[in-house]
């Protein structure tokens, strides 16, 4: 099983669907910023929330909302419009949290307001918390660029 955390912005309002078997699924389209060298890229992920999980949060999720998603990751392949093979990332959502440490200027309040709103941010796992104050003044990128704590030869792929 491949499990991961994603931090990003919703590309659209959540979509509610029903499978052919009658199961309810809410689909979030999540844009996750990443940096490759000096180039910024956005990786698009489809996040599936099954059955009635997070029903009380769904009405508050809108296009542009910043969220933290944790769940089982899978890669799916499909044929692009031009006939070339493409890949997409899909997440079966286990944990969903609002990200009050947004880097979008229109969603930032005063520093004092952001500090108060970040006091109790957690990822939903026992003893594990996210210190969003560290990331508040940086863009939301995987690895934060040069601050990575591993050498490139340590990465197995």
From Swiss-Prot:
It comes from the Bacteria. Residues 97-126 are annotated as: Disordered. Transmembrane segments: none annotated. Coiled coil: none annotated. One of its GO terms (biological process) is DNA replication. Residues 105-117 have a biased composition (Basic and acidic residues). PROSITE patterns: SSB. One of its GO terms (cellular component) is nucleoid. Gene3D superfamilies: Nucleic acid-binding proteins. Keywords: DNA-binding. GO terms for molecular function: single-stranded DNA binding. It holds the Pfam family SSB. InterPro entries: NA-bd_OB-fold, Primosome_PriB/ssb, ssDNA-bd. The keyword DNA-binding applies. Residues 1-100 form the SSB domain. Homotetramer. This is Single-stranded DNA-binding protein. It comes from Chlamydia muridarum (strain MoPn / Nigg).
